[in-house]
């Protein structure tokens, strides 16, 4: 049986929860209010069906958006550098369980992109998107 989108999002949230001080959500939160370690949430970009015979492989592409503190602060920039590194970063956390608790066959964090700023709550925050491909 193929995993549901909800199961995959919850699995991604669980992996993001392993990062100290990062507040992870299974859906985009109503308000952008990064804590000390920022916030992260998955958004489903696409689904490809019939990747193998029958219903053998369904490919889900997610964007994990990470929003950290005010862009002008040095600590925020250092935190972003940490999240982009492998050892303590988003990639290591997500790829730490490539089955997302047994609901996926495997996954890969393909890239980090769109490193930029976003305005919310009269504040400019630093943000980055991670592309995650999940094979379920």
Which residues does each PLM region occupy?
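Charged, amphipathic alpha-helical segments and their flanking helix caps
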Residues: 1-33, 43-136
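Interfaces and regulatory segments of ATP-dependent nucleotide/adenylate/phosphodiester-chemistry enzymes
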Residues: 38
